[in-house]
């Protein structure tokens, strides 16, 4: 069995076994006692993820947003809306959106996913912070479709385009474009 937990969730109880704050990632044998004396032993592949805080700066117009805080452990959407407060106007994905009016967010967008990129419109510059368990990119495969894709960037660190795209299961085609909101674009050319 495999289990992913955030360091902030420690101590964590699994069956009759409690993992304390000093627990690190690894394999653990956990015994499940049985009343008939035939105890079950499970080897648990435990991953303890670090906690992080993502700082976001919104310009007062439209900005791109994605997150490396794991959407499985943290309600990123609630934290983003709370951080934007009354300065937020619209949060939109490729297919859904919510807008802020009269003190209420309304619309069909109901979750922020690590695999996706979102557009956020604010009515003035705003900084937000989202705290939670840092996502493992391997747990969040990104699907690329024909046409434009709003793909999330699931890393705390900057990387060049080739390294950032290395984990995607995609073969670039001549003329494919990757575009940033502010920092330009890159075009793939077969050599």
PLM regions with names:
Residues 49-191:
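N-terminal exported-region signature
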């Amino acid at each position: 069995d495999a289990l992913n937990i955030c360091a902030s969730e420690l101590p964590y109880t699994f069956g009759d076994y409690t993992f304390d704050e000093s627990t690190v990632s690894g394999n653990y044998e956990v015994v499940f006692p049985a009343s008939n004396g035939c105890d079950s032993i499970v080897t648990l592949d435990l991953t303890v993820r670090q906690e992080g805080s993502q700082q976001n700066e919104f310009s007062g117009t439209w900005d791109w947003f994605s997150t490396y805080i794991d959407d499985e452990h943290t309600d990123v959407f609630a934290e983003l809306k709370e951080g934007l407060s009354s300065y937020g106007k619209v949060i939109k994905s490729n297919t859904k959106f919510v807008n802020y009016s009269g003190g209420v967010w309304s619309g069909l967008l109901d979750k922020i996913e690590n695999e996706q990129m979102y557009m956020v419109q604010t009515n003035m510059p705003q900084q937000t912070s989202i705290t939670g368990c840092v996502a493992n990119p391997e747990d969040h495969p990104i699907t690329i479709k024909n046409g434009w894709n709003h793909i999330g960037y699931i890393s705390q660190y900057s990387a060049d385009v080739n390294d950032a795209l290395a984990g995607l299961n995609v073969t670039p085609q001549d003329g494919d474009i990757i575009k940033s909101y502010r920092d330009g674009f890159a075009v793939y050319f077969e050599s």
